[in-house]
């Protein structure tokens, strides 16, 4: 609670939004430069994938850090394999909300339906619609990961000014 209060106070008083990042802890002076570069990367990755986070740790960036280091050409090739013609924009807002909520609830259909205030069958219908569009069954872990990474890759490319 104290951290939240301090952040809100800082944002209100200074009228700016502050973000901070840190790299790995180092023991020797010669490693400070590396830790600084990690913190800088954490800020870059955070701008793309973790917009809501105000404090970013390099070692907690997860898959976002990996995607950030991939060449754009490889990302484009991946999107072309996952989505027809690489077009990840074929999904409506409702479908994307469904997918993100489904992922947030660890692929649990019942809990996702409850959170979205829809009937379980409505959720299954939406997931089937996505399966028809992509060939990916998001109820299957491997397909869900592929789709999640594809959405992150699309977000990364968009942040770099590359629209597919």
What annotation goes with each model-predicted range?
Residues 3-164:
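Cytosolic nucleotide-utilizing catalytic cores of signal-transduction proteins
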